[in-house]
């Protein structure tokens, strides 16, 4: 019972902390945030939201506030494309050029380009 009284006294001396600074006042530094920092944070947050919405629209044409579903991402990774080409133009509809050779292939920036694999017919 005498041990429990010592523990209670020790907790009161440490102010609830047992970090080895018994009986010493705590030296916590409390940093206040300025209005400018708060404004800057929210500006950055808005930019991230705008960028996310823009990427979501470009990648799948989804409604605002929704990101592409896992199923859509999976189908895009497998090469199952929708009717829109990467640049938003339907395949050969507006520019009247039939593209042969690159449809269904992913773009790999690490490989060297092969100019013979692309053929345009007018």
From Swiss-Prot:
Keywords: Nucleus. Residues 39-45 are annotated as: Involved in NPR1/NIM1 interaction. It is found in: Nucleus. The keyword Nucleus applies. GO terms for cellular component: nucleus. GO terms for biological process: regulation of systemic acquired resistance. Interacts with NPR1 N-terminal region. PANTHER family: PROTEIN NIM1-INTERACTING 2 (PTHR35735:SF8). This is Protein NIM1-INTERACTING 2. It comes from Arabidopsis thaliana (Mouse-ear cress). The gene is NIMIN-2.
């Amino acid at each position: 019972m005498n041990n429990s009284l010592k523990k209670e006294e020790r907790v009161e001396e440490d102010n609830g902390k047992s970090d080895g600074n018994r009986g010493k006042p705590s030296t916590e530094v409390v940093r206040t945030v300025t209005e400018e920092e708060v404004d800057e944070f929210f500006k950055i947050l808005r930019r991230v939201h705008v960028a996310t919405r823009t990427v979501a629209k470009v990648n799948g044409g989804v409604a605002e506030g929704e990101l592409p579903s896992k199923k859509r991402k999976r189908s895009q990774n497998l090469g199952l494309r929708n009717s829109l080409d990467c640049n938003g133009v339907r395949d050969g509809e507006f520019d009247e050029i039939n593209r042969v050779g690159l449809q269904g292939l992913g773009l790999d920036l690490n490989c060297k380009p092969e100019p013979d694999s692309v053929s345009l017919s007018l």
